[in-house]
């Protein structure tokens, strides 16, 4: 039989391992762990009390380390939520789009795009949302023009993915306009607002010249557009063509002009298209605005009428340029095949056209968490209604329900979202632009 001393030596590593194991267990959930183990600090056996004190000391010493562990656990949970959110045949994501209140459109659009971009599936989301928006639009005049999460998604997508494109197209135009002499930088056409010393006929020519500069730059840029832009335009065109064939190009124009180029022309400083601290004169701002009105009418394939009679003098210019704009909308809606390069040794390299994957940041997780938490009941009801509308067979319906139940459990594990100040919904700048300027 081993002596008492040798037994202590033998058990010492086991004792230390037990203390370490308990330290790790308690640190993983301090609140629950201490609730059941705190009484060990008052145990009759002094060795138990000593062991507990060592456990408590380890927890305090390793606090920072386990905070990192807790963050990792939360990130893992968020990633599982994102996987299910992006998966499940887009049903959860599309349900959120259906039930999202106006006050959540901004955050929901940002959260949706962040999630799908992190899995390289942004275009899958946009194509599904575009098709659904077209199906739910009762009038071709409203196609991609009403305030909805679909139009907001397109605007956020354009802003995130088109910064370099819009800069390369429009920045040279703004530079040239700024270099023109003062007499070529007056654009008012409304005779009741024309300043002293200004001539309406000269202003009309200035408007035509400036608008032509913007139009030529835009209409010659189809091949510069990001491939993802052209895929979105192609999806809009094909989706609209099935239901409103006469409106397919104007629908593409609603995206590429109303939600992309026109807001940048009206507010070039917000897109970094002019030098910092550059002051744009009132006359030049008016010129930018009138140019966008002309371009938008071209995109809509309509002439000016009784609503703004002073703009009717530009109808000949519109008539002469409608074909140019329509041709541009057709070109940008064509998705080119991947480029190929033949190497000297005969091997062929095909262009990688896979979408860019952008990892989510903590602010993206927080935004997604809040939007889902606030809308979970609505999403649940919509998911249940979808099962009924789709007339699923019992086996598929059960799998559908099981998947959403798993998603709900993951959300329950996340608990309440972090407290953040929810921004007031101000609407999209291009919505405001469109409403204010009757485009």
Descriptions of predicted regions:
Residues 1-439:
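Extended alpha-helical scaffold/tether regions of large eukaryotic proteins
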């Amino acid at each position: 039989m081993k002596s008492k001393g040798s037994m202590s030596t033998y058990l010492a590593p086991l004792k230390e391992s037990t203390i370490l194991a308990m330290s790790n267990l308690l640190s993983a959930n301090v609140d629950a762990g201490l609730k059941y183990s705190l009484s060990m600090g008052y145990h009759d056996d002094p060795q138990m009390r000593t062991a507990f004190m060592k456990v408590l000391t380890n927890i305090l010493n390793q606090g920072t380390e386990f905070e990192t562990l807790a963050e990792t656990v939360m990130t893992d949970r968020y990633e599982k939520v994102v996987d299910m959110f992006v998966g499940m045949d887009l049903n959860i994501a599309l349900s959120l789009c259906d039930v999202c209140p106006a006050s959540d459109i901004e955050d929901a659009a940002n959260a949706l795009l962040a999630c799908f971009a992190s899995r390289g599936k942004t275009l899958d989301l946009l194509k599904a949302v575009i098709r659904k928006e077209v199906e739910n639009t009762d009038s071709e005049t409203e196609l991609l023009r009403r305030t909805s999460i679909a139009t907001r998604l397109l605007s956020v997508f354009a802003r995130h993915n088109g910064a370099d494109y819009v800069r390369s197209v429009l920045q040279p135009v703004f530079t040239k306009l700024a270099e023109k002499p003062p007499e070529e930088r007056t654009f008012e056409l409304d005779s009741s607002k024309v300043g002293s010393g200004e001539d309406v006929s000269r202003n009309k020519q200035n408007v035509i010249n400036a608008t032509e500069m913007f139009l030529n730059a835009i209409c010659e840029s189809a091949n510069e557009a990001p491939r993802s832009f052209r895929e979105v335009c192609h999806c809009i065109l094909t989706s609209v063509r099935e239901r409103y064939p006469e409106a397919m190009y104007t629908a593409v124009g609603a995206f590429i002009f109303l939600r992309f180029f026109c807001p940048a022309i009206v507010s070039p400083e917000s897109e970094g298209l002019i030098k910092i601290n550059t002051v744009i004169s009132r006359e030049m701002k008016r010129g930018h605005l009138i140019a966008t009105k002309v371009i938008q009418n071209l995109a809509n394939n309509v002439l000016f009428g009784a609503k703004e009679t002073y703009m009717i003098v530009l109808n000949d210019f519109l008539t002469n340029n409608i074909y140019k704009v329509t041709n541009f909308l057709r070109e940008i809606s064509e998705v080119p095949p991947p480029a190929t390069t033949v190497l000297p040794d005969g091997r062929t390299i095909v262009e990688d056209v896979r979408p860019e994957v952008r990892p989510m940041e903590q602010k993206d997780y927080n935004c997604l968490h809040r939007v889902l938490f606030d809308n979970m009941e609505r999403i649940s009801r919509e998911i249940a209604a979808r099962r009924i509308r789709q007339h699923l067979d019992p086996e598929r319906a059960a799998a559908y329900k099981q998947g959403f139940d798993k998603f709900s459990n993951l959300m329950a594990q996340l608990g309440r979202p972090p407290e953040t100040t929810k921004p007031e919904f101000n609407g999209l700048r291009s919505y405001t632009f469109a409403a204010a300027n009757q485009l």
